[in-house]
Amino acid sequence: MRKRFVPIALGILLVLGNCHAGNSPKTVSNMNSSVKVVELTNEVFKQKVFNYEINKTWKFEGNLPVIIDFYATWCGPCRQLSPLVEEMAKKYDGKIVVYKVDTDKEQLLAQSMGIQNLPTLLFIPAKGQPRSTMGAIPRETLEKAIAEVLMVK
């Protein structure tokens, strides 16, 4: 799999309209782990990641680096990647935050972030611009992105 990071087009965020979604994040958890991957909605995205209604340029709302897994339940490569994403959430607990976005339920959010291929992982460093990778990437590539993009060891 090619190791390709694509800068996120923030201009897409500027054309978003209001979207009403539930404010309660759902969690997805591996049964053997107490670390939870939070199911991200558009409203929670604006609170925890980027509030495009207030900010016209990228302004990360969080304190810790973030990985967002854009997926669909029917997507085979997404199902392959999911356990690895959960494993990274556990391994880097307290160092990064890991979210998941079901693109079928959160179409506006996926569209606003320019998501066209599944799975897509969005890496958001605490400072700097987000980057993404597409496809079911191997563990080594994911760990390299965490180290190089999120600057977490």
Please report, for each region that a protein language model flagged, where it lies by residue:
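N-terminal targeting signals for export/organelle localization
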Residues: 1-43, 153
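Loop/turn elements at helix/coil->beta-strand transitions in domains of secreted/extracellular proteins
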Residues: 63-66, 94-96, 126
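A short beta-strand-turn-helix
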Residues: 40-64
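Short pre-active-site segment immediately N-terminal to redox-active cysteine/selenocysteine motifs
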Residues: 63-66, 70-74, 117
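Structural signal for short hydrophobic segments within the conserved structured cores
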Residues: 38, 97-99, 130-133
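C-type cytochrome heme c attachment motif
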Residues: 73-80, 120
